[in-house]
C-alpha cells in the first residue's frame, strides 16, 4: 500500500473541490481515507492514504487524456 494521488486512465489525477468526494473515491478503491489537496503539484487533486498497490497512482510524466 502507499499514500499517493489516485490516477484515472492515462496517468491523470481526479480533480476535486471537496474532501468528501475524494474520501469516497479513495475508500471505494480500498484506501483507508483521502482528501482533496488544493493547489498541489497537480492542482486540486485527490490524495489517498494506504491505497492498495493494484490501484493506479499518478506517476511522473504527462497526463495523456
UniProtKB/Swiss-Prot annotation:
Disulfide bonds: 12-63, 16-36, 22-46, 26-48
First-listed, main subcellular location of the protein, grouped into a coarse class: secreted
Molecular-function GO terms, alphabetical: sodium channel inhibitor activity; toxin activity
Any one biological process term the GO annotation gives: defense response
Function: Alpha toxins bind voltage-independently at site-3 of sodium channels (Nav) and inhibit the inactivation of the activated channels, thereby blocking neuronal transmission. This contractive toxin is highly toxic to insects and barely toxic to mammals.
Family the entry assigns: Belongs to the long (4 C-C) scorpion toxin superfamily. Sodium channel inhibitor family. Alpha subfamily.
UniProt protein name: Alpha-insect toxin BotIT1
Organism field: Buthus occitanus tunetanus
